């Protein structure tokens, strides 16, 4: 199977989950009861990040940048998830939480380019 293709799809899922996280996070701060949706999207994103790491390793790619970026995405999502769980009652944490989310979004977009380039090399 083409594991890098599945890693790319999982990265797309992380990007969509990040956008969903942003919308539910903003809605939560506006008084809507979307805490469950925010938590489920965070869990889905975490599983997708772990899947990306597993798929990249299983693809046997020698690209160190691809491996490093996939581990980096999973690590920062895990940190973000931990911050969300630990400080859910503190409103000031959203200042840090939002900045990390923007970094995750940018990192996932960059990872998409690296996966696409590596996939193009392997599919030739």
Q: What does each model-found stretch correspond to?
A:
Residues 1-124:
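Polytopic transmembrane helical bundles with strong interfacial aromatic enrichment
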């Amino acid at each position: 199977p083409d594991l890098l293709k599945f890693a790319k799809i999982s990265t797309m899922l992380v990007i969509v989950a990040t956008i969903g996280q942003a919308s539910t996070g903003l809605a939560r701060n506006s008084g809507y009861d979307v805490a469950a949706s925010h938590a489920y999207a965070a869990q889905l994103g975490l599983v997708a990040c772990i899947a990306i790491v597993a798929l990249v390793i299983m693809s046997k790619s020698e690209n160190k940048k691809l491996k490093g970026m996939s581990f980096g995405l999973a690590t920062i999502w895990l940190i973000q998830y931990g911050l969300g769980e630990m400080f859910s009652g503190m409103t000031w944490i959203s200042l840090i939480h939002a900045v990390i989310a923007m970094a995750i979004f940018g990192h996932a977009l960059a990872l998409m380019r690296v996966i696409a380039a590596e996939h193009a090399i392997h599919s030739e």
